[in-house]
């Protein structure tokens, strides 16, 4: 993940100003500090703020130019769930993963995103032979493999999660999920209102007369705080950052591995030769997995409903803050759909 550097230029309370910049690479921090603390620091801070104002104005312009249709019209254009055939799962209820094997998640790591986090954009494994980025990419990759082996062999991180399949039905743009006590929880979904596009909502992929939905919450961040603090105490900030990035990638890989298990063993709609990890990372399988906070369902508060459905805080080390952020931060929470589309 990029590192945030905040520089506060102190003056009187009336003239206090703040410049906030983004460093994609750790080594860029020194360059930013040198400019901020140098004789032209004020000019640099002013340039940062001017660039950010230009970005805000461009974002606002794009929003104004979006051709949206009224929500009532978008709902009339919905494809509906009538064509959707519910898939009855083999097993319902919860499945707890108290200590998922890192080795089982490792094949699902998307290394392209790992390199992007270091500012090395390119597809893995081709980036390792890139004429300009290859040398640095190979070094970072070797360091990542060494630390990943330690994480796996010394059990430095614990992968924990809960997933389950529950009865569900759609009602307009909402998904209603029935918990173990027969109570319905309402999950409001957004609907695409862009003119000329499919005005879909996630609720369209759940049948109104009865269906099933998967829920999950998982993390690869148990133990990361202690591991990073140990590295920093030894003056090894690089390894602390590396551990954080690997925990992020392992969380996504863990989610892919659990989704594969759900499709084949719990839901049972995936048969025959399973997708390879490479195919799974590219989403080449039936069904979909989505996490809250992304465009299809940006409402983080829905995590509370899923946490309660799965009894996440009673069975794992994950906690949900009052602002609906998951602790540890290297975590995912969302829904799974069996729809063939």
What role is predicted for each listed range?
Residues 269-288, 292:
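Extended, well-ordered alpha-helical scaffold/bundle regions in very large, multi-domain proteins
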Residues 17-25:
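Short acidic-hydrophobic, aromatic-tinged amphipathic segments that line or gate anion-handling sites
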Residues 288-315, 320:
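A glycine-rich beta-turn/hairpin centered on an aromatic-Pro dipeptide
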Residues 24, 30-241, 245, 263-266, ...:
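Active-site loops and adjacent core secondary-structure elements that bind or stabilize anionic groups
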Residues 1-12, 16:
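Conserved structured catalytic cores and adjacent interaction surfaces
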Residues 251-263:
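Charged, low-complexity helical/coil segments in non-catalytic cytosolic or luminal regions
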């Amino acid at each position: 993940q990029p590192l945030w550097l905040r520089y506060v230029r102190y003056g009187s309370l009336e003239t206090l100003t703040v410049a906030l910049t983004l460093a994609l690479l750790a080594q860029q921090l020194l360059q930013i500090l040198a400019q901020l603390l140098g004789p032209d620091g004020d000019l640099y801070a002013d340039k940062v703020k001017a660039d950010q104002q230009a970005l805000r104005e461009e974002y606002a312009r794009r929003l104004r130019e979006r051709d949206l249709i009224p929500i009532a019209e978008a709902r009339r254009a919905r494809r509906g769930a009538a064509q959707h055939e519910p898939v009855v799962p083999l097993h319902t209820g919860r499945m707890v993963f108290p200590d998922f094997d890192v080795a089982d998640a490792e094949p699902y790591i998307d290394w392209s995103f790992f390199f992007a986090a270091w500012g090395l954009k390119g597809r893995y494994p081709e980036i390792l032979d890139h004429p300009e980025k290859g040398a640095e990419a190979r070094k970072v990759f070797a360091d990542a493999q060494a630390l990943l082996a330690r994480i796996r062999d010394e059990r430095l991180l614990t992968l924990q999660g809960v997933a389950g399949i529950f009865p569900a039905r759609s009602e307009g743009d909402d998904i209603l999920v029935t918990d173990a006590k027969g109570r319905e929880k309402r999950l409001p979904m957004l609907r695409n209102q862009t003119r000329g596009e499919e005005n879909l909502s996630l609720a369209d992929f759940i049948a109104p007369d009865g269906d099933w939905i998967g829920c999950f919450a998982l993390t690869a961040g148990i133990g990361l705080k202690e591991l990073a603090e140990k590295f920093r105490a030894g003056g090894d900030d690089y390894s602390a950052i590396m551990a954080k990035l690997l925990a992020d990638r392992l969380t996504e890989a863990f989610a892919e591995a659990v989704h594969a298990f759900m499709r084949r063993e719990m839901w049972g709609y995936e048969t025959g030769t399973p997708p390879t990890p490479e195919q799974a990372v590219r989403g080449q399988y039936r069904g979909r997995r989505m996490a809250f906070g992304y465009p299809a369902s940006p409402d983080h508060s829905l995590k509370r409903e899923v946490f309660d459905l799965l009894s996440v805080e009673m069975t794992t080390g994950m906690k949900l803050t009052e602002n609906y952020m998951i602790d540890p931060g290297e975590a995912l929470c969302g829904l799974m759909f069996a729809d063939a589309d």
